[in-house]
Structures are given as C-alpha cells and as structure tokens.
C-alpha cells in the first residue's frame, strides 16, 4: 500500500511518472490531503492513478472549510473516506452512492443533516461508520454495518433493525440518550464503549448478548452502581 501526502496541487506529469515507475495494477493508494485549502485540490488531478485509489483522507485545520467532494466518484475502487476537521455542514455527499465498494465513512465534525440521510441509506456495503448526531429513526437498513462510532447520538431505538449485524458500537457525549435498552436488540455485539452519556442512570441486563466480550464505561455521571 502507498500513502500519498498531498499538501498542494499535484503535478500531473509527476503523477504519471509515479504511475510508470512505482505504481502498478496491484498497488493500493490512499490520498492524504492536508493543504491550506483542500478545495483547490481537484480529484480530477489524480485521473491517471484513479483505479489504484482505495482511500481518501481529507484533513483541514485552517479557516478554509471543505465545501465540496465533487469528482470523488472518479475513484471507482474507493473503499474508505475520512473527512476530518472543518467541512461545510451542508456538504453534499450524493456522489458517494456511485462508489459501489465503499466500506468506511468517517464524518464526525458536524451532525449529519436530513439532506445527507438519503445518501447514507444507500451505502449498503458500508461496514464502518463514524458520525455525529445520528438518529436511528432516519436510517433505513445498513445490513453490512459492523462498526459504529457515534458522537452525540440522538436516538438509537431502531439500531437493532437498521444495523442487525453490528459487532462494535462506541457512543460518546450523548446527553439525549436516557436509556440503553436498544443495545439488547444488537444480537451480534462483541464490543461496547460508552463515554459521556450523562443522563443514563442504569445499565440494562446484557447477559443475553452472547457474543459480547468487551465493554468500557467512562464519564457516566448519573449511572448508579
């Protein structure tokens, strides 16, 4: 595997040279984009290696928030997308629907919006999801989802139906969650992590989750022992 750190607009001729000398058909490439303004780095620059790109990571800690991921569908073998730090809270993710191999999506800086759920609900191959503000009432079925990391979970009531094969769940800073009975419906769970669920007062009996092997609790200030 090859990780390419992109800090400025790439030189297309140098990318072609890289393709000729280092990158072969079997080389898997992850683009790690971290510039002063990631909006200036168009995905079309990477057309010559587009079939090799299996991961895109966008890191942005300047005032230039990421406004678009237009053109990302050029990477037809893309399996993982990480969008970290500042991005437009109305970021259009519609193009992800055409990425038939996408297994991982990380977008947890801003809460997911009602405009983004229709796309999320079509990502049937998704195995790993890291997100903020998830409401299970807005989900349709994500049958292949195995790992869920959620900040500020709004409602988990229907996760057992919507993500029946979930094996690992981590929930952080979620004061809207008052009870954890929905965990009982996640029959395949092997790992549970709870941190900052400040209004949960008691844990349900998890003894029927026969696959559960690990659990961590932190900052559960109202939880009664």
Where are these regions (language model features)?
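Concave beta-strand-loop units of leucine-rich repeat
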Residues: 2-95, 101-140, 144-178, 182-225
